[in-house]
Amino acid sequence: MQKRIHEVNIGANVPKKWPNWLHRFGCFMLDRRGWRVSGNFINEDKAILAVAPHTSNWDFFIGLMVVFSFRLNINFFGKHTIFFPPLGYIIRRLGGIPIRRTKAHGVVNNIVEQIKSSQHLLLALAPEGTRSPIFPWKTGFMHIAREASVPVQLIGLDYDTKTIVLGPIIQKVDNIEEQMQTIYAFYANVSAKYSAKCITNSK
């Protein structure tokens, strides 16, 4: 069942911020563009939000409007090279955290420690790790969730139906290879902005 953005209930455990005017602005922009929401948002203060398919810069704009609409206090990672002033200040205010991607294993460990040491942290990640076509997807987000002992919610940006799909929740990450098949199956039914860039099988 599709609902208007402002009709979605956000649980008491979900960390929130943003003033009323940004909440109204986010709702207005999504309504104006015809976007709706389907499903329920995870009621946790720590979680990985796997947002896909990520094939366009528009994905960030849609995601940001959702964050404003729900008043979500979330974090996301970006290349350290974009965190220069004054842009870096704005990105940090929006929840951005700079990372260097030269050492993937070190990045995972660093994120895990940040989650463990934080009182609350909703971390939005693109499971593909790139806007370019790729298969298999990168599994760093699953390793982070497993090592930090936090759940993963799958969130789809369906451009065909203009729906933000709040999908299934993986409460415990254990068998990553098997659980990735569940993830591929979910996103196979979500239409990307550029469908040719979203690959959910090896064919």
Question: Each predicted region: which residue ranges?
Answer:
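Extreme N-terminal tail/first-helix region
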Residues: M1-R36
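Intrinsically disordered, low-complexity regions
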Residues: Q2-E7, S118, S195-A196
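Soluble catalytic domains of membrane acyltransferases
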Residues: I10-P15, R32, R36-N189, C198-K203
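Long hydrophobic alpha-helical segments that form multi-pass transmembrane helix bundles
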Residues: R24, Y194-K197
